[in-house]
Amino acid sequence: TYHAWDGLDKETLENDRKYNPNGAIEDDNGNVIGFYDNQIDYYRQTHYQLLLNQILSPSWKLNIALHYTDGYGYYEEYKNKRTLVEYGLVPFETNGTTIEKSDLVRRKLVDSRFGGGVFSFDYKGDKLDASIGGGLNYYKNTHNGKVVWVKNYLGELNPDHEYYRNIGRKTDGNIYAKINYEILDGVNFYADMQYRYLRYKINGNNDKWDWTADPAHLQPLNIDEDFSFFNPKAGIFWKINNNNNLYASFSVANKEPTRNNYTDNLFAAQPKSERMFDYEVGYTFRKGWFNAGVNLYYMDYKNQLVLNG
């Protein structure tokens, strides 16, 4: 599909809201003289799954799932007046003038592999429901960028000139147990516990140029981090009658930094994992067609990973 993901300034939005700046080709004065036809993004995934659901007895059930996903994609774009050294290209001379910037076409690619499995044993009794389970997943992706074409370039340019490459790997495993027990008629206690371990490894070069380095170069990626998380949750639910319910809960949630938290944060301290304590209490009312409820909560974050942009 053709790119359409850049925003518009207020003036353009008011006067020409259908204008799409993606793929614009500019002359030396910055005037748009055309658009690049192959300003596209492409991605495909192939999914494989193997599922087993086995009823072992009236009370016990076994679930197993294996999965594998193969993915590949890229986006190609025309870039105006780009600094050549940022793409591993040597400035060139023409008519006695050194050319350090030129228009070019670049292609950024990703090749990914994701596989793993999950399982659970589920028990259902008169007053007790319980489950134990877990999962293990492995993800590997290769990011790289190529220069497809450079305007009026007089230096050496190999076909599909590669200017960055990095390989990321993530291993993610967990085990858990959870119960729901009817303490009294209409009063249920529920709890679950999860232990999760994961490891990140990213090696290679990022696609961002570090002008603060001496000499300047592509930002290196050398990340090897592991995390261990314990995520418990407990609560109580009280069905007062057919119309009124009360509930309260406490939970702990931990979250690892994402790939972008690492690659976009190379000039600052390494990102840390996020931890949240969640306290909730609520009430619901239901009668006929009418439903109403109130939920009070307090989330206590440490090292919150906040989205920006």
What are these regions (language model features)?
Residues 34-77, 104-126, 164-188, 224-231, ...:
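Outer-membrane beta-barrel transmembrane strands
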Residues 2-19, 78-89, 143-156, 205-216, ...:
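Flexible, surface-exposed loop regions and adjacent strand-edge segments
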Residues 1-49, 77-104:
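Acidic/polar loop-and-plug regions of large Gram-negative outer-membrane beta-barrel proteins
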Residues 83-106, 111, 145-162, 245, ...:
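Feature marks flexible
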Residues 96-120, 270-272, 278-280, 285-309:
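Outer membrane beta-barrel strand-and-loop segments of large Gram-negative receptors
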Residues 27-37, 45-47, 97-106, 113-114, ...:
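Extracytoplasmic loops and strand-loop junctions of Gram-negative outer membrane beta-barrel proteins
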Residues 135-137, 163-301:
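Structural signature of Gram-negative outer-membrane beta-barrels, strongest in the C-terminal barrel
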